[in-house]
Amino acid sequence: HLMQFETLIMKVAGRSGVWYYGSYGCFCGAGGQGRPQDASDRCCFVHDCCYGKVNGCDPKKDFYTYSEENGDIVCGGDDPCKKEICECDKDAAICFRDNKDTYDNKYWFFPAKNCQEESEPC
């Protein structure tokens, strides 16, 4: 669920996903086209691809189960589809954390007209 994704980003990356990544580059936020502009935008591209591979549940609307163990997010539950959503979100949150140093404000509210290049495949 997107609200859980926001929570994971806060826990792992220590910042608001909605504020920092809700409209960043070509892939963070709604939609996505063109080429990722930097490492943080690539996190969103990979996350979009990950969601695209999920079958049998809705990544944006379905709630999943996770726990925290020694500071790490551990995806759980009996539903493999929902667990897959959790793994997508967890990986993206870690990616955001690992690329905070190269986050560039020039890609915040980046105009879609700058994302016209052909997209690479997942």
UniProtKB/Swiss-Prot annotation:
On tissue specificity, the annotation reads:
Expressed by the venom gland.
> What GO molecular functions are on record for this protein?
calcium ion binding; calcium-dependent phospholipase A2 activity; phospholipid binding
Residues that bind Ca(2+): 27, 29, 31, 48
Q: Which cofactor is essential here?
A: Ca(2+)
The terms describing its cellular component in GO are: extracellular region
* Disulfide topology: 26-115, 28-44, 43-95, 49-122, 50-88, 57-81, 75-86
The record's Gene3D superfamilies line, in alphabetical order, gives:
Phospholipase A2 domain
Q: Which residues form a coiled coil?
A: none
Compartments, record wording: Secreted
- CDD domains per UniProt: PLA2c
Q: Which domain of life is it from?
A: Eukaryota
The record's listing under SMART domains reads: PA2c
Catalytic site residues? Answer: 47, 89
What is the uppermost EC class here?
A: hydrolase
Keyword Calcium, does the record have it? yes
Q: Which UniProt keywords apply?
A: Calcium, Disulfide bond, Hydrolase, Lipid degradation, Lipid metabolism, Metal-binding, Secreted
Query: A single Pfam family, by name?
Result: Phospholip_A2_1
> PANTHER family from the entry?
PHOSPHOLIPASE A2 FAMILY MEMBER, PHOSPHOLIPASE A2, MEMBRANE ASSOCIATED
The free-text function statement in the UniProt record for this protein reads: Snake venom phospholipase A2 (PLA2) that has high lipolytic activity. PLA2 catalyzes the calcium-dependent hydrolysis of the 2-acyl groups in 3-sn-phosphoglycerides.
Q: What is this protein called?
A: Acidic phospholipase A2 4
Organism for this UniProt entry: Craspedocephalus gramineus (Bamboo pit viper)
